[in-house]
Amino acid sequence: MSATIPARDLRNHTAEVLRRVAAGEEIEVLKDNRPVARIVPLKRRRQWLPAAEVIGELVRLGPDTTNLGEELRETLTQTTDDVRW
């Protein structure tokens, strides 16, 4: 169950409410004692690794008996590592 706060408290204590949400809490905002919004934490974003780093880790793990290394080498030409964000 999520915590509830009046809209006035959200206005007056925004930083504290956002800290609670960042810590994983869901907060429902009330206006005139009725729920009007829910503030929820964002899902964690995937962290992408450069292809060379992934290959290096696979090499460190030992011999490839699945042919995965060869498939990855073929795929390296299709990566976006050189694209600037």
UniProtKB/Swiss-Prot annotation:
Residues 1-54 are annotated as: Not required to interact with or neutralize cognate toxin VapC4. Residues 55-85 are annotated as: Sufficient to interact with and neutralize VapC4. The keyword Transmembrane does not apply. GO terms for biological process: detoxification. Changing T66A: No effect. No longer neutralizes VapC4 in full-length VapB4. Keywords: Toxin-antitoxin system. The keyword Translocase does not apply. InterPro entries: Antitoxin_Phd/YefM (IPR006442), phD-YefM_TA_antitoxins (IPR051416), YefM-like_sf (IPR036165). One of its GO terms (molecular function) is toxin sequestering activity. SUPFAM superfamilies: YefM-like (SSF143120). Gene3D superfamilies: YefM-like domain. Interacts with cognate toxin VapC4. Belongs to the phD/YefM antitoxin family. The C-terminal domain (residues 55-85) is sufficient to interact with and neutralize VapC4; exchanging the N-terminus (residues 1-54) with VapB5 allows neutralization, while exchanging the C-terminal domain (residues 55-85) does not. Many single residue mutations in the C-terminal domain construct but not in full-length protein prevent toxin neutralization, they are not all annotated here. Antitoxin component of a type II toxin-antitoxin (TA) system. Antitoxin that counteracts the effect of its cognate VapC4 toxin. Upon expression in situ, in M.smegmatis or E.coli neutralizes the effect of cognate toxin VapC4. This is Antitoxin VapB4. The lineage of its organism: Bacteria, Bacillati, Actinomycetota, Actinomycetes, Mycobacteriales. The gene is vapB4.
